[in-house]
């Protein structure tokens, strides 16, 4: 697992590039994390750090958690997250982790809980086509059809796509592009949509699967380079048209007229 940050989904907007390119973005407010614990191989069998995010009143904590934060001499934190690291010597208790973590990153993985849709049928939940509208079908147009087997095995296998609770599950969207980040206001702008509703908590991490993809910023530069070439061609066209306009117009019937 790579190190990450916990943030809040503010909403969606769009960003305009210099070339006029419009990009849909999701705005995420990042909370700076504080390293609460440092675990080494001698203690745990692996190197890891425990990071606390968000503030919470001590009155909302139980006695065990109150004692834990008093022992660590730090403010109570709402979320505690553990990340495994390879170079444990770089991290110390009390250090803060912020948006600087993604300074050199182009893509990130974002994990959050999807919006709950309640109990849903197979057509909405699993995109089933349903049964026929007529020709012998009655009161089962949106049903899932048969679910069982024969006498052997005589049961429905686990994982069978059926009607049930839809949404309200943690999902990870991989390789979302970072459009820009605002270090002063702790905001990060990510291309595309992120699971969950407004004000829902999200976990942002460095992308696990490294990909080669043209980013929107690179595309913007290419469009700008093309726009710099095309005005010169347009200038040449305008010059030719202006020269034609300057030529005196021939009067009708002037051919073959003797003076």
PLM ranges: what are they?
Residues 1-259:
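Extended basic (Lys/Arg/His-rich) segments that typically form rRNA-contacting surfaces
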